[in-house]
């Protein structure tokens, strides 16, 4: 028998606050901090149009939430505190027999080395792109989306907000409106640009945009902008189709873009500018993955590190 839905709601959070205050004897400041973490997660679910039923929230949901926080430049220390708050909340839910599962149980703390979501290899990304069925009405659109996310390192909000007038075709640049309405120019490679215009000058012409969306690049079948959740589902479907078991989201292509550039020797400041990071310290996190690549290379190929 299916469980009765139990949604994360202001009323449930109020009961949780009472539990913290009365059962655990926490101070008002501590109670406020713990409830803030749960409210932040609830806001994320609302923005992404994800069900707030605690029995449908999975580890993947939590992982994608932290990928979202990372993309907002929320540091590892703050992420660790938020994760602690969510773990406390789910302990309360299980103690109250509101759920039998805890999606936070196996998620490591960012302070223990969890700074980034999974990164896809170039081969995995190419495999996903090659598997897209171009005979379907959405095929060329989805292919162009993956190309632009990986080829330009865009946030999902920047992808779905991209306008045709923001594409400088002759110069090979995109004008991106990022966080805080800050503008930046991001180069786009010839192959990605070609695939993008195959969609714009092909499949997109068969969709009649609604009045407010005539300049929007990526449209749904109703002629309006895609939502974050639609992009997430497209990415998830492609990953499953290709047997990719890594926990990924649209943000993964942005992280892969940055990591592959730095692994190839790109200038850190140039990558910072392309990503639209306010501080280079945020971009520097990606160098940890490059360090791991160097260590793997050393242990695999250097005679002093080979196993005898």
Predicted features and spans:
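Conserved catalytic core of the tyrosine transesterase superfamily
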Residues: 1-308
